Amino acid sequence: MTFPEMLTTYITIDDDIRSFLNTQTEKISVKKGTVISDQNTLNRKVYFVEKGLLRSFYFEKGKDITTNFYPENSILANKDTIFEKIPARHSIEAIEDSEVVFFLYSKMEELCETSLTIANFSRR
């Protein structure tokens, strides 16, 4: 399922949202083993997994500890950075070849100022 298709299961996509999707989102192909967000960095991107599988993990005392898996149609972000404005506690890695759409959280915040639909959706 594409990101716009997923959105239409929850909301009606109007012109403002369509413009956001066309100008503020980017789709990337990620190879298995690629880290798209590193622990201890500031990453304010929101990701949607169109295809593949991602995981979040951290290192502690030399051990790699998986905290979550994100299959297709999942939305994820480093909430530490977005909401607490601190470096991420977790890394995000593709554990299969994946197709991922991302956008900056700040751009979604701007859209929320003019789109009640997105403002309400983002609070779910």
Question: Locations of the language-model features?
Answer:
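Cyclic nucleotide-binding regulatory module and flanking cytosolic helices
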Residues: 1-26, 81
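Short coil/loop residues immediately preceding or within conserved phosphate-binding loops
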Residues: 25, 43, 64-65, 87
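Glycine- and acidic-residue-biased ligand/ion/polar-headgroup-sensing regions
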Residues: 33, 44, 48-55, 72-74
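Short phosphate-coordinating micro-motif centered on Lys-Gly-acidic
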Residues: 36-41
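A short beta-strand-loop-beta hairpin characteristic of the jelly-roll/cupin
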Residues: 55-65
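Cyclic-nucleotide recognition modules
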Residues: 66-124
